[in-house]
Amino acid sequence: MLFIQDDVYKEYVKMMMNIVILCMILCISLSFWIISITASTYSGSLRPISPWRWLVSVLTPIIIVWHGIKKRSLDNSGALGGLLVGFILTIANYSFFSALLTFFFISSKLTKWKGEVKKCYDSEYKEGGQRNWVQVFCNGGLPAELALLYMIENGPGEIPIDFSKEYTASWMCLSLLGALASSAGDTWASEIGPVLSKSSPRLITTWEKVPVGTNGGVTPVGLISSLLGGTSVGVAYFVTQLIFVPDLEIAAPQWPIVIYGGMAGLLGSLIDSYLGAIMQYSGYDESTGKIVNHPTKEAKFICGKPILDNNAVNLFSSILIALLLPTAAWSFWPRL
């Protein structure tokens, strides 16, 4: 009987904690709304943000980060970074948020997938694939900055990508999509390619066969995976556009978002591989049979110089795609 009472008490405390947290979130979102109303009153150029958008922008990242901590996809520093990035992208544009959410959830699943296989060739493999603040900001920092610039230019809200009517805002939307799709493509390629590929990877600079896990090594399976990874982000963005953007029938077609997402994933993976081959050290540790990213006495040199680490390579490749994708899209985007 005593055990039953203890269980009931624990459930009651848990329920009350959830209620208290929800009330705090409501208070925070309403406080932000009051501040935005006050700011828009004294500045005619600012549009007030609805309390519903404030609530979604505060509540949703908290739920996702809590889920990430529970599933060991984020450590404590990564959780704080994820809260900031998630809040900025959600309040700026729901399409931004859906693209980020798709990248985070699928990439987290893939990082944990076949972990026992990845341990055999990756000396830096982490159990659970927990992301820290550095990884969060290398993948989400640029999109967060672009989302802030988007809000300065256009204000919070969803718009159709239409270069003829909203050139700057559309440029930023495609740039953000490119950054996230590039990160997704690289993640899919590095997590799926080495596991499923039946052939040895080839170094992208010399096309020589290299051990599995070598920085700069590519396989057909990995390249196809990167295309699918970028496409998944593009599909998420496109579907959100269909749901939240009004008057799409009088705007430029939005379906190219999916195609450009796939292109960003593939090209981002190729750029990442090229940078990794020349600016990341790869060596084969004969004592462990694993790839190492730093020179050691036991490591046999394969390629690259110890200039950048994996996070820096990811950041540089996403920046390049973020600059190239909207430039290409502007030239070929269908116009009414």
UniProtKB/Swiss-Prot annotation:
The keyword Transport does not apply. Keywords: Membrane, Transmembrane, Transmembrane helix. InterPro entries: DUF92_TMEM19. The keyword Transmembrane applies. It comes from Xenopus tropicalis. This is Transmembrane protein 19. Belongs to the TMEM19 family. It is a multi-pass membrane protein.
